[in-house]
Amino acid sequence: MNIINITNKSNFRFMYKKEFLKIMDIIQEKFNFKKRISVDLLITDNKEVRENNLLYRNVDKETDVLSFPFGDPDFFDHLDFIPLGSIIISHEKIVAQALEFNHSKKREFCYLFTHSLLHLLGYDHKEEDEEKIMNQYTKEIVEKLNIYR
């Protein structure tokens, strides 16, 4: 079983660990990882996300999610799992974006978690073609959980 270490500093009762582990299973299979994968997840508020965004990216604004990859998976050959990295999600942004896009918090959490995992694997959306690929992968993975808009 894949590993997710969750720290919840928000006032939101997080109920999606099962879905997040399924997302990790799909990622593991899709990208042919032979070992379990691991990720650290912090769920917090806009203030802490903004502080981390400024500290690590020199960007002084709130965002929905930050992803910090641990680097080349081959570096961890001696372990029985591959630590992909750390993810920070703003619960406040999740709630606001779920309302804005007219879907559930569950769908927004799962979508952003998947999006973040793809960032940990090196995917980005700075260019239009990269964004299309990343959005397509994210959509495909979330839909495998039968979670739609």
UniProtKB/Swiss-Prot annotation:
Sorted alphabetically, which PROSITE patterns does this protein's record hold?
UPF0054
Under Gene3D superfamilies, the record lists: Metalloproteases ('zincins'), catalytic domain
A cellular component term from Gene Ontology for this protein is:
cytoplasm
What Gene Ontology terms describe what this protein does at the molecular function level? metalloendopeptidase activity; RNA endonuclease activity; zinc ion binding
The listed locations are:
Cytoplasm
What span is annotated as the signal peptide, if there is one? none
* GO biological process: one example: rRNA processing
Which EC number(s) does UniProt give? Answer: 3.1.-.-
Supply the InterPro entries for this chain: MetalPrtase_cat_dom_sf_prd, YbeY, YbeY_CS
The UniProt note on the cofactor reads as follows:
Binds 1 zinc ion.
* Reported cofactor(s): Zn(2+)
Give the protein's biological function. Single strand-specific metallo-endoribonuclease involved in late-stage 70S ribosome quality control and in maturation of the 3' terminus of the 16S rRNA.
Cite the HAMAP family for this sequence.
Endoribonucl_YbeY (MF_00009)
Q: Which family does it belong to?
A: Belongs to the endoribonuclease YbeY family.
Name of this chain's protein: Endoribonuclease YbeY
- Name the gene behind this protein: ybeY
